[in-house]
Amino acid sequence: MAGTGEVYKGSDGVWGFRVKASTGQIIATDGGYGYTSKDDARATLQLLLQGDYAGPIYEIATLACGQEITEDTTLDSDLVCAGGPALVVAADNVTLDLGGYTVSASADTVGSGPGIVLQGVTGVTVRKGTVQNFGAAVVIAGGGNNVVQNLTCQDNVGSVGGDFGDGIVVDNSSENRIEGNTVRRNGPYSGISLLGESRHNQVLDNIVSDNNMLHLGDPSAGRQAMGIRMEGPKADHNTVSGNTVTGSGADGIVVLPTCIPGSEPECAGSPPNQHNLITNNISNDNGTSGRGDGIRLFTVANPVAPAHTTIRENVADENQTNGIAIDAAGNNNPGPTENRVIGNSAHGNGAYDGFDGNVNPRCDANVWEGNDFRSVNQRCVSGEPAPASGSRSDEV
């Protein structure tokens, strides 16, 4: 193959290679998932230049801001756009490979719209590059069974009155995989969000850090961003596993209560977010705005609380408020929440390592078993049988 080659290390730490023509234009790039070492990338590049490479090669396409992607596409340079969306994936079963390059909003349009939108598509992969300075880095809107992988999503900040303020958003979309991304300095909502009826999604092995940004245009709003949040309603059967979540303005990993507008009376009849699995995560040092838990099942008086959640084998240390917390169920819950907190470790948190706000009955129907906590707010959180309500020994 004519041309000269170069190897490069992407923002995700994975090595890849490119082939350049004599003009300096990139004419081919590796179409695989990258290499863990520089030597492996170089060896494969040499095979390509010798004509012996049998792996996938993607043709380089020159892209324009706002372009619709309808076929396999790899960036050949950075892309700077006057606001978002910068790129819209509008066809099923295609790969958008950023090739280690950066898609960003220009300095005067920071926070305006999303960077990359997957619009009602299935079977799409977006990978290997950086998306920054939009209202959100990547939005999966509808569709399903897509992959967002090995991206750096940073400095995406929502403006007042805008729809976003997140790193990666899954909006009414199911069976997607969000894996191996670095998601940092986004806000004021979250690093990664699952909104609406988003089911059977996998959020795996991401580094989610320092998501605590202010709203653009209103310095009094923001810094309440959550690391990973399942908002719903009907955000069910999702798996959040292997992530490292630190430095969130509010809570690290959160399942929120639900309230469908117009529900009568006061949220009654809203479906809970339920059957979600939170496992093998590290969620430390969250709550930089002054209040935040490592992992939280969040509710307030009227919205319907999360139910049937499993929180298993996580670490939640040094958070501003609690390590792992289940808020008291709201007034309109259709029945016991029946969450399970099993085999976790939490130490050095500001209030309690383990917290359950349900006091009548103690811990409701939630199960706390085999956890390593040094401080809890009531005995049932330690896995001990709760005494009769009203006893002086109810509290720890």
PLM features: residue spans?
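Short N-terminal "domain-start" leader segments
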Residues: 1-23, 30-31, 39-42, 47-52, ...
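Short, tandemly repeated low-complexity microdomains enriched for cysteine and small residues
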Residues: 28-34, 56-60, 217-218, 255
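Short, T/G/N/S-enriched strand-turn elements that build extracellular solenoid repeat scaffolds
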Residues: 64-68, 83-90
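Extracellular beta-strand/beta-solenoid scaffold signature
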Residues: 81-86, 109-117, 133-140, 157-171, ...
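Small-residue (G/S/T/A) turn/hinge positions that recur once per unit in extracellular repeat modules
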Residues: 91-94, 121, 143, 173, ...
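Leucine-rich solenoid repeat scaffolds
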Residues: 338-395
